[in-house]
C-alpha cells in the first residue's frame, strides 16, 4: 500500500511540474511577443552572449525608471554567463559563486535558467509588478477520476490562469 501511495503522489507531483513548465512557456511567449511588438527593446547579439548586450538590455529598462530584476536564460546562454571571467564579477558575486557554486545574481537581477526558454533568446525584465499580471482563477487542482471497474486509479489535474503584459518596456 505504501508503494502505491508513493507512486500516485509522485505521478501527481510530476503532473503539477509539467503544468508549471507549461506556465513558463506561456509567460515567456507573452514577454517575447510584447518585445517583438514594440520592436525597439531588442538587442541583437551574434554568437555567444556578451556583457555589452546584457548591459544594453539593462539600459533599455532603466531608461524608464525601472530596475531590471530578472534575467531569464536557457542553459546554453547560461554557459556564456559562466565564462564572463573573474575580472567581470564583483566581490559579492564572487563570494556567492565560491559558497554556492552558482551564478545566481548579476548586477541588480536574479538569473533564472529554464529549459522552456528559447535557446537563442535572453529575457531581461523589470519587477513583475511593473510588467503585468498573472491572474489565477483556479489554482492547480487535483480531482480523482478513478475507474474501479477496470481497477484503475486516475485523476484530472488542471488550472485556469491568464497572462497579461501591461507594460511592454
Residue spans for each PLM region:
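Helix N-terminus capping/helix-initiation residues
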Residues: 1, 50, 74, 120, ...
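Long, contiguous amphipathic alpha-helices that act as assembly "spine/axial" helices in icosahedral shell
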Residues: 1-40, 71, 111, 151-162
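Short helix/loop capping segments that flank catalytic or ligand/cofactor-binding pockets
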Residues: 3, 80-83, 165-166
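Secondary-structure junction/capping motif
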Residues: 6, 34-37, 41, 45, ...
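N-terminal short leaders/motifs
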Residues: 13, 17, 60-63, 105-112
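Extended, solvent-exposed, turn-rich assembly/linker loops in the middle of proteins
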Residues: 33-103
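Sequence/fold signature of self-assembling virion shell proteins
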Residues: 86-169
Amino acid at each position: 500500500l505504501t508503494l502505491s501511495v508513493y507512486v500516485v503522489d509522485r505521478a501527481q507531483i510530476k503532473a503539477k511540474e509539467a503544468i508549471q513548465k507549461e506556465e513558463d512557456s506561456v509567460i515567456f511567449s507573452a514577454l517575447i511577443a510584447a518585445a517583438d511588438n514594440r520592436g525597439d527593446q531588442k538587442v541583437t547579439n551574434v554568437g555567444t552572449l556578451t556583457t555589452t548586450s546584457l548591459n544594453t538590455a539593462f539600459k533599455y529598462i532603466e531608461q524608464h525608471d525601472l530596475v531590471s530584476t530578472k534575467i531569464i536564460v536557457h542553459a546554453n546562454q547560461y554557459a556564456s554567463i559562466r565564462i564572463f571571467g573573474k575580472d567581470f564579477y564583483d566581490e559579492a558575486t564572487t563570494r556567492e559563486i565560491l559558497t554556492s557554486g552558482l551564478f545566481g545574481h548579476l548586477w541588480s537581477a536574479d538569473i533564472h535558467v529554464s529549459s522552456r526558454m528559447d535557446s537563442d533568446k535572453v529575457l531581461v525584465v523589470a519587477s513583475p509588478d511593473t510588467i503585468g499580471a498573472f491572474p489565477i482563477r483556479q489554482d492547480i487542482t487535483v480531482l480523482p477520476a478513478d475507474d474501479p471497474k477496470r481497477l484503475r486509479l486516475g485523476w484530472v489535474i488542471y488550472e485556469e490562469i491568464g497572462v497579461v503584459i501591461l507594460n511592454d518596456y
